[in-house]
Amino acid sequence: EAKKPCVHIEREDDPAKQVRRYGFTAGLKISVLSNFEHLYIYDTSYPVEQNDTRLKAIVREYKYTDYEDAAEELLEYLGKESVYSGHFDEVWSEIEANVNHKSVDELFLQQINNWRLMLGKEILNCNPEIEMEELGDVVQSYINKILFLRVCEDRNIETYQSLLQIADHNSYQELIAKFKAADSRYNSGLFEEKLSAEIIGNVSSSFWSIIRELYFPQSPYSFAVLSSDILGKIYEIFLSQRLAVVDGQLSIVNKPENEDRDIVTTPNFIVREILRQTMRDNLAHLTDEQILSLKCADIACGSGAFLLETFQILCDALVDFYTVNDKSKLIQTDVNTFKLKFEIKRNVLKSCIYGVDKDFNAVEACKFGLLLKLLEGEDDSTIASFHPVLPNLDDNIFYGNSLLESSDVPDNQVEEINPFDFGERKFHYIIGNPPYMKTEDIKVFTPKEHKLYPKRYKSAYKQYDKYFLFVERAFKLLKKDGAMGYIVPSKFMKVGAGRELRNYISSNKSIKAITSFGAHQIFSDKSTYSCIIILQNKENDSFTYSEVDSLAKWKVRDLTSFSENKRNISHLGKETWVLCSDRLQSILNHISTQSLPLGEIVGDDYIFNGIQTSANKEYIFQPESEDRQYYYFKYNKQLYQIEKKITKPYFKTVSGVDSLNTYRTFKPNARVIFPYKRRTDGKLDVIKLSTIQRKFPYFYNYLRVIKSELDRPDRDIKPAPTTANEWHRFGRHQSLEACEIAEKIIVGVLAQENKYAVDTNGT
């Protein structure tokens, strides 16, 4: 932030607060304030408070007389070479930790959730009959309205503090009038009435609180620099939760499909890299007409992170084209710096950007983010001639289930499943981070959809993951020569369930590139082995395979950070894909010529997965205590006891750590309830319920508690039960006999290193 020399930043507090608010809102480690005589570097990883002085959060300060002696230091802290080499991140790594722990998105999400509860409680008090789903929609709608107008104030599109004046007047009539005027001016559907007079008139106190919290000092943010991608991250987490009445109180709870897992957002560097590989490098060769004719989609768009960046890339490509060919289409903002005219940006959004999501609130959040993105860099003067200012995005961002079409769904399930018909629509580019969901979870959360997927998708094979289906669906929606870019777990290349997806991709010869991140963790607090896969709707003889060695260097495009190798597509098929760098490939080839597959030595029947209960929460426990006959354990916070003889030792990883060591024995760390008995021929049969009641009464009592979980219609048991009294069986029968073998070698699935532990406990 550069100030005139007459602004005394060396003694005034406001310039320091301003630059810190800008930096904090933008999610930056540091921000620089200078009036040319003085230069200050501020830590902007935590919010500004009203009584902060200019000295708060200052980490470096220089006077112009220091510049010569401090030149090397300044270049290290702020220099272009430092940033591009990645050294900048190392220099400010301590502050980076603060950014991650006290980030703007976490604080703002907490504030938005407080508003949801405050507004929701007052609306519920006035209208007790309102459905929870409608309540959530109405609350989100009003928060969007207020937030949109507040952002427009800081961007000089709306009069600054106009909302605050309404709050100070305590006039709900003025607020309704403001919304109506905004609806007339912007006309994007954002300001459509949702019970406005009824709600605003009765709960205006909540609106005044929300509005006041959007201004300093109650708000630490500068909405002029609140980027759409940061807002998108906030909404991505926001969308994983819903309003619900719990024990008589309105609360925010996870949506059912998110109850047992963390919601992660796609890092910006991954979004940008997928778009670079999929489309950006091609745009330099296109004319403006060709760029404006592109159709780009995310068919599981969420809050729109990929679409926001796609819109930006298309606008940047047009600026590059017009800078060389027709500067009359541009507005000059500085020396050799230009931006697109608003009309052309508007055209890009309406003509090129498309999205689908099965969550209605995600659709609304995506539209909201795109409209704010459209207004970035604009002010009242650049949009004054447009009426309405904003386009309606109802024909761009759709509410529906993109995996199923109407013809796939029985008539009596259409409303619940909400299939989306793409019709003749095809796309030049499809990008995204599709949902990851195991088959077991699909059965639990969307059992009706689960039955329909195998009819449409070849990749719906065995224990498939939902992202398999999205890869197949996206590829089918590409125009000729179109491209798809996704980040997905890399396990599809290895696991048996990925066999048909591998076959589908390889038989179409569609691979353009695969970037493997190996053990590098892309998503914070989430252990997932990820890769970027780029497919083209054309036949390729070869593809580029890359392995990332250093994630930090790869982020800044340091070519030494990854190996790039050409691979022949004909070498891939439905069997496991073994992909590695050229250096490792030669080692692997040497090992292969000197070795035999394990199956040839011990027999394929003796290589097996562990047991699959399909009810781990109910059947696997870690004892709280034990005596000679019983184990004591907790289930849903209640203490139970169970006969030791009906359990077996079990090993489970804890927080991703497997504690296995090669050639060493290990101790099981849990117990599994094992309701099976051995026959004379060595096979296992499930123990009848009547026998359990007689021989294992404590287990029988516990079974009665968990029956509702084990006997769910969507719980998949194979082979299918032959009687109504086999609901306590495991989900899969294979490997049960093998698991009783006294001595075994155990290796973790997708292990990062060679760990072959020895089991002597019958685990």
Residue ranges and their predicted role:
Residues 51, 159-168, 286-293, 314-348, ...:
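Flexible phosphate/Mg2+-sensing switch loops adjacent to catalytic phosphate-binding sites
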Residues 1-6, 22:
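Conserved catalytic cores of phosphodiester-cleaving nucleases, focusing on short active-site segments
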Residues 4, 30, 468, 475-476, ...:
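Polybasic, glycine- and aromatic-enriched phosphate-binding surface used to engage nucleic acids
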Residues 303-308, 312-315, 367-371, 701, ...:
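Phosphate-binding glycine-rich loops of NTP-binding sites
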